[in-house]
């Protein structure tokens, strides 16, 4: 079964938890609402892109997306059609790669990314069942659907250039089966030379659900 992320926050984000935590500590940022901060402070956001702190895929529809990483997952097969192909986003990994719903930065709960064991728990007011482990987080809706909010891949520490391909299923299936997905690949580099900004709407469009 494909790994997946539900983009309830209308975006997906890729980062290494320790890279982000060390950046926040160095910049003396104590606010947990990292997403709001980066939306308001453009110079700080651009610094995250220059240093490879995180890569957001903004302004995408609230959908369930299949997630694949080159070298660890099988590529999308001929039942899918590629819609986008972007390359060259800086990303520094120190303790594995997290791929999350972008709302997981609002707030960014650092301890959630260092769980040592699997754990089920519930949250008020509806008593929704949640699950967290060293490799993934999800919760169950009132309709018993599982919504994945964060998944982790074990990736060696280092600096990488991230490539992003977006795919759409040629023949749609019923929800919650994903009909769109992203295939990510990482190319190791010694240093970052310049950077690309995925929030530049004129250059990048990640909303593959509109390309069916």
Where are these regions (language model features)?
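Arginine-glycine-biased low-complexity disordered regions
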Residues: 134-136
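Beta-sandwich interaction modules
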Residues: 140-154
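Intrinsically disordered, low-complexity segments enriched in polar/charged residues with Gly/Pro
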Residues: 77, 138-141
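Primarily secretory-pathway and cell-envelope proteins
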Residues: 1-127, 132, 171-212
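Extracellular structured ligand-interaction cores
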Residues: 150, 159-161, 181
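A glycine-anchored, Pro-Gly-centered beta-turn/N-cap motif
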Residues: 155-168
């Amino acid at each position: 079964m494909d790994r997946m992320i539900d983009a309830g926050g209308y975006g997906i984000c890729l980062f290494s938890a320790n890279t982000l935590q060390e950046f926040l500590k160095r910049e003396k940022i104590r606010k947990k609402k990292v997403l709001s901060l980066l939306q308001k402070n453009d110079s700080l956001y651009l610094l995250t892109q220059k240093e490879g702190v995180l890569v957001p895929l903004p302004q995408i529809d609230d959908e369930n997306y299949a997630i694949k990483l080159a070298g660890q997952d099988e590529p999308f097969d001929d039942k899918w059609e590629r819609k986008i192909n972007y390359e060259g986003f800086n990303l520094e990994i120190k303790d594995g790669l997290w791929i999350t719903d972008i709302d997981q930065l609002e707030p960014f709960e650092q301890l959630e990314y260092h769980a040592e064991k699997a754990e089920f728990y519930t949250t008020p007011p509806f008593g929704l069942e949640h699950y967290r482990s060293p490799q993934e987080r999800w919760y169950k809706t009132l309709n018993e659907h599982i919504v994945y909010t964060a998944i982790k891949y074990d990736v060696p520490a280092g600096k990488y250039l991230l490539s992003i391909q977006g795919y759409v299923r040629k023949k749609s299936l019923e929800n919650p089966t994903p009909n769109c997905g992203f295939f990510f690949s990482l190319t190791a580099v010694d240093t970052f030379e310049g950077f690309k900004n995925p929030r530049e709407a004129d250059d990048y469009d990640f909303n593959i659900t509109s390309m069916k």
